[in-house]
């Protein structure tokens, strides 16, 4: 009797027994309704069910005296029996406790799905939900279970030196907050939670300090160094104050504001009245000569004559009566100016109310005045003295004589000579020497006279180093920032039309992690991936459902929504399989289900894999959920083990089987991972553009495109995000791409290279990257923000850290659209995660040992600027508000540098829009500017203070940190690595073969045919070592030694005739009529394959009927139904069964690809039977147009892979014309998008086996190019 699926050793949990092959027994039917799938399976292993649940029992003993009794599990596609304990063992949990009622909704709107009922009969119509575990008998209710107590353990871990120093700094900054307040008021019972709060507070204080330092340095530090810098005016600056409401003037080296004075009538002489119009003529000028001090008052003890007055060398008053002469020289009567002390007693006290600052001169103007205007002025002790009028007066009266003339030479002659010989210079040193030669009284008289009569103002102290150092530093930083802005502008200014790359043929995995997204969002994402302008056979949609969870607004769990969208029959239920997740304690043990199939959308038929993480039976809250990082690591770890042919978990083995045996593509073929979020839709040409960039530059290991908003007009919240999304790509990422170091490749739209193009070195699947990225102990604030909040950014950081010589790039040509948060609360939560993860990741990047560039021209400097810019965002907004206030109130000069930076920032951005003719972005920029306080103040401050806002696990608790970290482990279900069995796929297939060989005619393959391991490069099975159990009579024909590159060729490099002869000489390889018509021997032979069918029991595909040519030759995927994960494998070193595309993707040499011409119609979704009954596969059109070489099939005389219409010429001498004719004929029948030159040459070699055309490969290549160019 043929074996059934339940007899296979690859039962969903039989992988736990790695010691021996199972002993399969056949049960006799009790009646005519016997279900052939019901078979009892006995195991050498003591208790399979207990072994499966060993994660709940630490150090589970392997008892061998347990009786095995079959127990039938029902309620899913295919039943199976498992032994249970007849006599329970103390302390062993052999069954799962019934859960509390479930299906309840949480406070955040998330509803957890109900656990299924497994008591329904096998043929029940009850819809089977995504149950996390198989049925478990309620053994505890029967008193058969002794519950295990919690396991308490203490683990001491060493802390790094950096961590120890950070803890010290944290306590230094937060020591003033006692812990008992955090315990009682803050309700922080755990030490690690309190430590994270202290770290958060310390970081927040540092950020506030940084903002305060920036504002202090920009606004106040300069004033400390140069206190009166805003209280000094030179001649040009004073001239700017000539308005009606801005009336400044200088008198005797001091500046006064006469705005509230000049309009009043201040003259006490009726004959000389004033007016505001007349007063405005004096605004903004130095009025010292209009207020001469009597010389007897200005120079006491030196001038005794009240008649002495000085002549002006270069001064003409606007009106003569504006000169305020006081004392005896005043000609008017009844005026206050008649008082000789009017200047000191009346004028000076009145001017004090209008005083503003100093009237200053710089050295250059003093020097030029001495040269061009012949002024006799000089600098002494930073004060400017002008003796021009004094020297002019002496010269004027030098020819006069008389005893009544005053003594005009009242100053010391040495001082006068010094001013004449050193005019325009600083004479401080010489002046001190002259004064020291005088008596103290005489020197004092000389200085009093100079200060009262000849003082003009101060040397401009704003030009001194003390006052200029601040401005120069700000200018230097401004230049660097403006240069960075300009570089970003140039990076974004990529004019010209989009490039149109040719369609590439690289194999790509489209990874889509999903959590609680809705049906509309998921459908939009899946449809966009299916509609990509990329070869459908070379892209794989890989969806990972992170838990069996009902999202807010959904009526079904997210995995159910995904499977319904893909057309999976809800009656098909996969079995949960073990794998290791990222988590604490028992959370590391997880179960997942695998589904595969084809998804059809608008003419595209794309294979898919769906992995549903369903969790352990004991999980009630969010079963299976481990986070997005775990979903990414699941695929990365799987591809890593595929690459190195390493032992895999049961879930990974099932994925391998589905990809290799069901879909028909070896997972080692895939070269790229296309990461797309479940709320993101990609444009049709996006993937090909991203892959084209990596194909052009093999140094690129990661690349992203531009992400735009799909709902930009939905709400005000989305509107303020449009421009922010644009500049984050076209300025930030475009600039970083110049260095080849994009610091954040978003997980919603990025491509990573799986392995390098040269050498096959693993990249994103590198063990180093995975080990760091899969860190399970996330117990500090820094790790929480890296791994829990910003996993996508940290993955990019790890790639840059471990592959510093490679490039991370950005291309604006590839575009995707994502759904931005439309509610303020959602945006707040998103930006909190993004901002905090950005800070922690930038800190990590700062300390990477190898980053391109040097000093200010390095990526490290750019990262520092980004980090500083993120931290001081609130200070930036505060400074802008300050500028607006001081400029609008006129209390300070216009900050030209600051305004130039702002203008450069937004002006260059606007120029980009204009040049690219994206004028709408100018409007979005204005919206962004109006919302600038939100982006720079509210969101950052909220994010900084909420840096410790995340969940803490209860399994691992850190109770103390110092030189060592003490961790208390408190777990109901302790985890150890031995709970998960690991096998290589070769071993897994071998066990499957051994089990099937008990009921098969074919012996097991020899050891020589087993797949060998290749380390360090991607590896595919040798076609010659892959044999089908039902098509090969023995394993003796398997070659003992294989050449990878030779055997991966559709035809091989030699011995073609030998292999063809082997095929034709084997009766099982001939497409005889008895098989075609479904004769009894072949029908029995096909029926004997049922136990090894990849579709397994419960599948909608019936291999018996299809082999007989029955109606509707439909692959289950072609009808919209999906293949649930079935534990059915083909034996090792055997050829894959028919793939989802209707033909083997990798056939061994000499094996007919589609040689079996069925009697029935081969109708499929997207294909139909050809005129000769030949299979026409979906997505490929007429089979006659498809090259057998491009499909991996051989050139044989039988089967669909034969050279139709072409005969083999065995002559040694052939004409070139004949070769060209057959070359043209052969190419006309091929799919030119997939056929290669090598396949074409191999076909010609086969058509002319004795012509020696192998030596004319170059000539053949030229003819191929010529024919293609002419077609």
From Swiss-Prot:
Which sites does the entry annotate for glycosylation?
A: 407, 713, 836, 1055, 1161
Which coarse location class applies to the principal site listed for this UniProt protein?
membrane
Topology term for the membrane: Multi-pass membrane protein
User: What InterPro entries does UniProt report for this protein, alphabetically?
Assistant: Chitin_synth, Cyt_B5-like_heme/steroid-bd, Cyt_B5-like_heme/steroid_sf, DEK_C, Nucleotide-diphossugar_trans
Question: Where does this polypeptide localize?
Answer: Cell membrane
Induction info reads:
Induced by the antifungal agent caspofungin.
Put simply, this protein is called Chitin synthase 4
Q: Which gene encodes it?
A: CHS4
